[in-house]
Structures are given as C-alpha cells and as structure tokens.
Amino acid sequence: MTQDLPTPRGRLTPDKDLSGLTWLRVGGPADWLFQPADVDDLCAFMAELDPAVPVFPMGVGSNLIVRDGGLRGVVIKLGRPFMDISVEGDRITAGAAVLDARLAKEAADAGVDLTFLRTIPGSLGGALKMNAGCYGSYVADHFVGAQAVLRDGTQVTLTRDDITFAYRQTDIPEGVTITSVTLQGNREDSRVLHTRMEEQLAKRDATQPTKALTAGSTFRNPAGFSSTGQADDTHELKAWKVIDDAGMRGATRGGAQMSEMHSNFLVNKGGATAADLEGLGEEVRKRVFQTQGIDLVWEIMRVGVPEET
C-alpha cells in the first residue's frame, strides 16, 4: 500500500505478517497493522484515514482464516490499553481485548455468572461481534451495552436496540471497532461458579482437540443453536454429526485435517496453508450437501485474498 496514512501515537506496522497472530498459524500479510495507544488515538486515526482504505478489526485470531495473499488496508488490533475490567454489582464492563476465559474467571471471583464464556476461545470484542455462545447461553443473553468507534472516528454507545442478535451473528457493520462491552450475569456463589467452569474445561478437553492448531468450531450447527452440554441434548442437526454422516471425519487436504477427535474442528497438522484449510472446509460443505441436502454455514471467518499463482 502506497497511500499516506495518519501518524498515530500507537504502533503502525507496514506489511505485517498475520500468520503468527492467528490460532491456525496461516495467512499472508496485512498492508498495515495498527495497534492504538488508547481510544482517543483510535478515534483520531480513523477520522484522518482515507475513507477508501478498508479497515478490519482483529481480535486474537481464534476464529479466523486469513487467506494466503493477505489483507488489503488496515488491520486494527487492540492491546493492553483495552484490557481493563470493572465490576459494578451484577454488571461487568471489560475492554474488547479481554480474553473471554479471563472475563469468566474474574466475573466468577466477583460472584457474577458469565461461566459460559470460560471455554469460548477469543476476546470479548469478537465474542460480541459473532454473538458467541456455549452451553445454551449467548452474549445476547447478557448484553447491556458497548462502546465502539465507527469508520469515521466517531465514538458511540451501542445498546440492545442498536444490535440485532442471531445465532452466531450480529448486524454490527464491518469496520466498526468495539472497544468495550458491558455484560450482566446472575449473582451466585463464587466457589460454585469456579467449580462449574472446571467441569466445563474437563469436558471440553476430553472431547475437543485443544492442543492442536485449530480455530474452534468450523461450521455453525444446522439446528440453529449451540449445544447445551446437557445429557438430554441429542438433536441430530449438529455440525459434527452431519460431517460424520458424510464420511468426512479425519479428511485431509495438504496439511489440513478435519479432526479425528471432533469432526467439526478444522486443524493445521503442520505446514497447512490457508488455501488447504478453506479448501478442505469447502470439500466438507460440498459432501454434506450432496449426501444430506444440508448447507453448512462457516462459523470461522475467512478474510483476505488468495495467494497469486
């Protein structure tokens, strides 16, 4: 990118390789990576940035495939200045860069039940953007409000009336950067909450490839809701089930594989490219549609351009 960009107080890095910033460890470079010093720095930068330059707010890369040709424009990555957490009664306000797991633990310390976040990979801004959920609870169920910076640098407050929530998605526009989120949870004994989270972690580690290079669930459940984690949760329209029925558990392409442990987890077995991973996912979608007439929808976000050949 040759355009002149504003000079921020934070860090602005050209031609930044993004593969090391994603959990799948794949992807090409961003034209620019911007790490703002604080909210004011972010607002000023966005206000001065040419409106024609694309902007992509990036969390911790836990639910993301960056294509091998990289991302055009500016990738915004929030860091330490956006990691504060404050508690007021049953409400928790946290910076968008706070990890979901950390928020769940600190909320539990305060006797506030946000335990559903404990096993969700990623940070709070991304969790809001995709209405993340687990064990029958979603961000939408706890959402009070958020602070955000629009593409023109305006800082705004978002309420429930400003966001439409659906399964694994919201209508928050592209280019809007969430900076903090307020959630509300039921009051409960801290020890009970921590015990619940330990049980959730044990169940996750026993059923999911947590030690592999993965981006979490690859496809949304066709049923249109997440697993509740309860023993009576036996509905057939789970992504892993239809993938199994299509014979795609363990399927490979290059260094990519649909996990043998949990077939809705796309993993980098070593040396995979973004094209391997996305291509295998598309093979799975095609096979599931051919065998069962079900159109699987990606849960992992895929961004950027393919590598030129």
From Swiss-Prot:
Q: What are the subcellular locations of this protein?
A: Cytoplasm
Per UniProt, residues of the FAD-binding PCMH-type domain are 25-188
* E.C. no: 1.3.1.98
GO CC, alphabetical: cytosol
Catalytic residues identified in the record:
R168, S217, E299
Q: InterPro entries this protein is in?
A: FAD-bd_PCMH, FAD-bd_PCMH-like_sf, FAD-bd_PCMH_sub1, FAD-bd_PCMH_sub2, MurB, MurB_C, MurB_C_sf, Oxid_FAD_bind_N
Q: Under which main EC class is this enzyme filed?
A: oxidoreductase
**Ranges annotated as biased composition (Polar residues):** 207-231
Q: List every stretch annotated Disordered.
A: 202-231
The pathway is:
Cell wall biogenesis; peptidoglycan biosynthesis
Q: Which PROSITE patterns match?
A: FAD_PCMH (PS51387)
User: What is this protein identified as?
Assistant: UDP-N-acetylenolpyruvoylglucosamine reductase
